[in-house]
């Protein structure tokens, strides 16, 4: 799967996201749960961001599960990759019933995800209907 940022860009892997989250937010959730949650966010990236732009078909994504290699590169590049940590933190907060923390985590996630979406819109041409000239 080619990353969104071409050669020379810096990206995060599944295991890096999990390790960084566990370091800043110790929790009792297993690696499989976190991989599933990472699959959710990259599924959103694929469906709502990359597939709506030219070249989106070059980015393949079929989801992550326990059999996915942990060195798989995630889709959102630096400096927007903190979205992964905020998303995972929000999922944990919600599962733990910590709704005020969940709201804070989701606010941070939404801000970063929106910034990433805007970056992608500037970098890649959105798909659209072709204009017919008479």
Residue ranges and their predicted role:
Residues 73-82:
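Structural motif
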Residues 35-36, 103-107:
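Short, charged, amphipathic alpha-helical segments
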Residues 98, 106-110, 127:
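Generic alpha-helical propensity signal that fires on short helical segments
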Residues 26-30, 95-100:
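Charged, low-complexity interaction regions
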Residues 33, 80-81, 101:
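Generic detector of ordered secondary-structure context
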Residues 82-94:
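Short, hydrophobic/amphipathic alpha-helical patches that form generic packing surfaces
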Residues 1-73, 111-134:
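Conserved short "hinge" loops at termini or chain/domain junctions
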């Amino acid at each position: 799967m080619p990353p969104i940022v071409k050669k020379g860009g810096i990206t995060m892997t599944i295991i890096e996201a999990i390790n960084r989250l566990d370091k800043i937010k110790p929790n009792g959730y297993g690696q499989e749960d976190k991989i599933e949650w990472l699959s959710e966010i990259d599924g959103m990236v694929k469906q709502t961001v990359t597939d709506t732009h030219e070249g989106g078909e070059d980015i393949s994504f079929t989801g992550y599960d326990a059999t996915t290699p942990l060195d798989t590169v995630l889709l959102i590049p630096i400096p927007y990759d903190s979205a992964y940590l905020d998303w995972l933190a929000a999922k944990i907060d919600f599962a733990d019933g910590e709704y005020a923390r969940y709201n804070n985590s989701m606010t941070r996630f939404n801000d970063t995800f929106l910034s990433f979406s805007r970056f992608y819109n500037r970098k890649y041409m959105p798909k659209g209907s072709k204009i017919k000239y008479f």
